[in-house]
């Protein structure tokens, strides 16, 4: 039986698990939990600047630390679990020190570190592996970073993305494949939406190149801006563009579809299936409210 999967994030009053304390808990996955700790030690200036939780807010919204830990352990349960976190050594140190102070035992935990996973999968040093930086690269709606529930949700999403790209790397890691990279380009052709899609597409291509440095990536979706900004978006033009993409795809060794399929991606998947070109799926980016679907 597969162990339940959770993602955990702590906001803390400092960096030392033996001197500082947990100020906020965020847990998502098989079951969710979130709470502020009302009686945590005072936050260091750096910690306060990051999480923005004032002592007054903690007292007003929080619960005593012993109660919060008890509720967290109740949600985790007594059976073995998998716990995803971005920088596992940090959160693990605080959880173990907290449980030791309260005299409670923890369930068996398989720690999964998305920071380590991202560094191993994509060793390119020019790509930041910070949680916020990766969320921006992938175009995810983040809300308020450095709040526990938000960061836990992002860590879980990153874990799922890393799993997808590990699978792609296993299948395309040999040789020097030419890979067609497709993303959910949408919008009404205005310059703002065009540039947004273009930036997302090339940020994703840089990530893919960091994972598969020996591959050559074809990114036609990133070039649609030059056509769209000219104002020519008639049906005939669109059909000709898709046909050109299909011809290009036929010369590639693989297709990677990123995100919720757009009409163009559905067409490209059909071309790949008809031509026997292997295709793979990976998460894409979130579309902002001002882009029409």
For each feature predicted by the language model, list its residue ranges.
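Anionic group-transfer/hydrolysis microenvironments
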Residues: 11-13, 26, 87-88, 115, ...
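Short alpha-helix plus adjacent loop in nuclease-associated cores
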Residues: 112-129
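Acidic, divalent-metal-coordinating active-site segment for phosphoryl/phosphodiester hydrolysis
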Residues: 147-160, 267-271
């Amino acid at each position: 039986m597969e162990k339940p999967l959770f993602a955990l994030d702590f906001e803390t009053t400092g960096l030392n698990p033996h001197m500082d304390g947990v100020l906020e808990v965020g847990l998502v996955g098989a079951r969710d939990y979130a709470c502020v700790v009302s009686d945590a030690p005072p936050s260091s200036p750096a910690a306060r600047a990051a999480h923005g939780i004032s002592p007054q807010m903690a007292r007003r919204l929080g619960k005593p630390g012993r109660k919060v830990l008890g509720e967290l352990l109740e949600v985790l349960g007594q059976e073995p679990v998998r716990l995803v976190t971005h920088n596992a050594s940090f959160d693990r140190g605080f959880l173990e020190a907290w449980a030791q102070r309260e005299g409670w035992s923890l369930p068996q935990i398989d720690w999964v570190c998305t920071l380590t996973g991202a560094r191993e999968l994509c060793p390119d040093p020019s790509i930041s592996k910070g949680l916020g930086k990766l969320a921006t690269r992938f175009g995810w709606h983040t809300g308020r970073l450095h709040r526990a529930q938000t960061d836990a949700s992002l860590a879980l999403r990153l874990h799922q993305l890393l799993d997808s790209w590990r699978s792609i790397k296993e299948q395309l890691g040999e040789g020097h494949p030419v890979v067609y990279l497709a993303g959910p380009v949408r919008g009404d052709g205005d310059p703002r939406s065009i540039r947004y899609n273009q930036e997302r597409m090339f940020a994703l291509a840089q990530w893919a190149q960091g994972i598969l440095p020996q591959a050559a990536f074809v990114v036609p979706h990133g070039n649609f801006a030059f056509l769209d900004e000219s104002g020519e978006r008639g049906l005939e033009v669109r059909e000709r563009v898709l046909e050109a993409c299909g011809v290009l795809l036929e010369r590639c060794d693989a297709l990677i579809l990123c995100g919720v399929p757009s009409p163009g991606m559905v067409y490209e998947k059909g071309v790949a299936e008809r031509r026997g070109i292997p295709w793979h799926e990976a998460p894409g980016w979130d579309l902002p409210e001002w882009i029409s679907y």
